[in-house]
Amino acid sequence: GIRDRVYIVDIICHGSPSPKLWREYAESIQKKEGKITYLTFKDKRNGWKSPTAYVKVNGAERPIKDYVKVFYNRCALRPSCYECPYATTERKTDMTIGDFWHIEETIPDFYDPNGNSLFLIHTNRGEGLFEKIQGDLDCRLSNTTQCWQANLEAPTKKSEQREEFWNDYQRKGIDFVMKKYG
């Protein structure tokens, strides 16, 4: 059956921001500055500890810190993110993947400033899949204490400013909320 051919993998997730907000943000930049060549989010050129978004307009590149701040202050996430049924220790998948936060504290000799991935194996099928790919990876064995992070057991907490943010957005628009909250 299909279960023999498909692996079920879930992702450790902080949350997903509103696609409408991202689209309007890009449209606002383009309207004010000109055609966007590219717009990136969580760019790692300065390492994963200081992710920045960049926009390139008319050949000039610049960081965009306001949107990043809005993302990390948890105002712009989708409502379902705050009640995510998958952010739990009871995973029903073969494997969980995500960023290995705080690895520099728990396995310092393995820390990579561009990021380390975390694989949590839940089933024999997940273990079999990992055995197939681990030869292509540089791996270290860890334990749940070393790799624990908040979104492994609970959804992201809703910002106390979320309702105010969305009310401001609906009344005053994207530029206003980016200036006020970003």
For each feature predicted by the language model, list its residue ranges:
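Long, compositionally biased charged/polar accessory segments in the mid-to-C-terminal portions
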Residues: 30, 34-182
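Internal, well-ordered alpha-helical segments in soluble enzyme and binding-protein domains
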Residues: 8, 18-22, 77-80
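Conserved small/polar residues in nucleotide/adenosyl-binding loops
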Residues: 1-2
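Ligand-binding grooves and catalytic loops that recognize ribose/phosphate and carbohydrate rings
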Residues: 19-35
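Short, conserved secondary-structure transition motifs
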Residues: 12-24, 46-47
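Short, acidic/small-residue loops that bind anionic groups at enzyme active sites
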Residues: 5-13
